[in-house]
Amino acid sequence: MLEEGKFYTRREIHNLLGGELQTYLPAKDGLVTCACLTLKRNPDAPNTILVGQSPRVLERAKQLCAQGGTIPVFVKRNTNKWEYVGRYQVERCSADVTDIDKYQQLSGRTNLRMVVFLKES
């Protein structure tokens, strides 16, 4: 179905996997279907997902951490060009201040509440 290294639009990702078109952790039937990550907000993608303070975003990240299994991960390479980089699973989720501080410095963001560490499966 998905081909590693191939580019997809968000509409194509939505049609294939379901979930919302604009969030970076789309969900369908209560499960996160994939991750769509930008390097601007997630400079270590696809190995980490940096989670901000929005309650909706935090809830979705917690769902990903709890659901188990693997998800397809896409990294944005250009306008509406999302590269499929493979299937990943959650290695660990951290709200530890040491991890938060490290990734806030790396990303330049100041609103992080959680870091989700992924590993390729």
Walk through the language-model features, giving the residues of each.
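Aromatic- and Lys/Arg-enriched surface recognition patch
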Residues: L58-A61, V75-S121
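Acidic, glycine-rich low-complexity segments with interspersed aromatic residues
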Residues: M1-E83
